[in-house]
Amino acid sequence: MDSASCLPKCRQKPIESPPHSVTMVEINLSYEGDLHCSAVHIPSGNILVTDAPVDNNGRGQAFSPTDLVATALASCMATVIGIVARRKDIDLAGMKVNVRKFMSEDQPRRISRLELDLDIPLPAHHPERKLLESAARGCPVHHSLHPDIDVKMNWNWRGGPDQIAG
């Protein structure tokens, strides 16, 4: 049977989402020219722009696509930590995450390492410390990254006189 004779039968099957796909968000992107893109988050209408980085033919006037990957990881970790903290009635106002993105020196061009400094406004001996750290490691973006990307997390628990990096 050739593919042309199969086509009508194949089209009769309904398109189903994979069983592991729980939610869907639509984002519409337009290439604006000169290595700039504009993306619209359909549910909210928020607009995000990107530019190619200076080291890859761009002007670096906005986030690059790989900057957004790094930003997504930092934001996801902070958000998931925040979700866990809210459930436990823990105030994390002032939490900060700084992320540094390193690109590979060989080909293909890709993110090789992401280093995150997580500044948590709680003492190092906080009883939920391990839970919050585990939440960060379990964020969906972290699980979505290629396993060859080296992710380093540096923890700064600064909620008291016993500040330590972990």
Feature map (PLM): residue ranges:
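Extended beta-strand/beta-hairpin segments
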Residues: 6, 18-71, 81-166
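Alpha-helical metal-binding/catalytic segments enriched in His/Glu/Asp
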Residues: 76-77
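Extreme N-terminal basic, low-complexity initiation segments
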Residues: 2-8
